[in-house]
A protein has these predicted regions:
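Short linear loop/turn motifs
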Residues: 149-155, 295-305
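C-terminal regulatory or interaction extensions
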Residues: 171, 177, 252-260, 289-291, ...
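Conserved ATP-binding subdomain of kinase catalytic cores across diverse folds
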Residues: 66-187, 245
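Regulatory N- and C-terminal appendages and interdomain linkers associated
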Residues: 1-68, 72-75, 287, 311-340
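A residue-level signal for conserved active-site and pocket-lining positions in enzyme catalytic cores
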Residues: 90, 136, 176, 227, ...
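Conserved kinase catalytic-core segment
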Residues: 120-137, 186, 191-256
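ATP-dependent phospho-/nucleotidyl transfer catalytic cores
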Residues: 152, 157-222, 267-271, 283, ...
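C-terminal hydrophobic structural anchor segments
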Residues: 252, 256-301
């Protein structure tokens, strides 16, 4: 994790007005959230290059209505990417002239990108997933490449780049459902301690990956993510490096969009999913071969990172109402573990 201790302590001594939120962000890049001053695009050229591999934003020739129709057809033909949330697989159309801006097209299972349109049931899912991924990144948690992108009708969607695909082919990747030999429908049955044991068994960097895994678990707790089930943790094999914990993906603050859910984590932690305390995380850490010092150091780093998380939240595309709700949620979860 990143260490913001010096910045955190310095900010404590600043006059109050320095802490006030900026009221102007103007047009911002959908990839990095930083201002766009001269471009008519929704991305900086460098951000386009980094995420799409070209200087111009690819054309996404769908509006929300026909995208949902196509997504339904894909699901019915069993080509959709697995998961409850509607999502489709995309690739850049390669049969175009080199000087033309490439299009993103639906390709079934074997695309390079996964697109998630807005939900019919939950508000602002793309914006909330995007900012949560950004918050994880500022904490120093590795995340898969991701961005927001606009459809033709200006609807915002969440898009992520697959990490198990390269120009050379497919990389070996197994989620915890597969490694524990459970059926997909049993993805909520299990514990974080069982996942840690699987990481210790199969990872080429076992203790480091268990530590990184519990950083993701703590982050999920702090951000109200109750959907980090067995399929949302994976091991990814890179050439010559063996299997290691996959960068974080599917980070959604479900507690914000589904207020009826009283659970705090998707899998059990110290045999609990609710009313989690410091002692529960300590028991889980120790069960995975990590000691109290590792937990305390990790929590300290999360404390120092909180202002950075809230700054990212303020710059995001989330509505003001949900920015406030999200900030309150984060504050309450920090206090629940004794962090202030």
């Amino acid at each position: 994790m990143k260490n913001y201790k010096k910045k955190y302590l310095a900010s404590k001594n600043l006059p109050m007005e320095v802490h006030e939120k900026s009221t102007f962000y103007g047009r911002r890049c959908l990839y990095c959230y930083e201002p766009l001053f001269e471009s008519n695009s929704d991305f900086h050229e460098a951000c386009n290059k980094r995420f799409f591999g070209q200087l111009k934003t690819p054309q996404l020739a769908y509006n929300l209505e026909n995208l949902q129709e196509l997504a339904t057809q894909v699901i019915q033909s069993q080509m959709a990417v697995t998961g409850v949330q509607a999502k489709v697989s995309l690739s850049l159309y390669r049969k175009q002239e080199k000087n033309l801006t490439k299009k993103l097209t639906i390709v079934g299972l074997y695309g390079d990108y996964i697109l998630k349109p807005p939900s019919e049931h939950y508000v602002q899912l793309p914006e909330l997933e995007s900012v949560t991924m950004h918050m994880a990144a500022v904490c120093g948690i590795k995340v898969v490449p991701h961005s927001l992108v606009k459809l033709q009708d200006e609807t915002l969607c969440y898009i992520t780049k697959r990490v198990d695909r390269t120009r050379k082919g497919k990389l070996h990747m197994e989620d915890m459902c597969q490694l524990s030999e459970r059926l997909t429908e049993d993805k909520y049955k299990g514990s974080h301690e069982q996942v840690a044991k699987l990481i210790l068994k199969y990872s080429s960097s076992p203790l480091l990956d268990v530590s990184n895994f519990y950083e993701q678990v703590l982050f999920s707790f702090f951000t109200g993510n109750t959907d980090m089930h067995l399929k949302n943790f994976s091991l990814l094999e890179k050439e010559g490096q063996g299997l290691n914990l996959c960068p974080a993906y599917d980070l959604v603050p479900t507690a914000l969009v589904n207020e009826t859910d009283t659970e705090e984590l998707a899998l059990t932690l110290n045999a609990k999913k609710r009313k989690l305390k410091y002692a529960d995380f300590l028991a889980a850490f120790e069960n995975g071969g990590l000691n109290k010092k590792v937990l305390d150091n990790t929590l300290e780093l999360f404390l120092y990172a909180k202002p950075e998380m809230l700054t990212v939240l303020e710059k995001s595309f989330v509505s003001d109402v949900y920015k406030m709700k999200y900030a309150v949620l984060i504050e309450s979860r920090y206090k629940q573990l004794g962090l202030k």
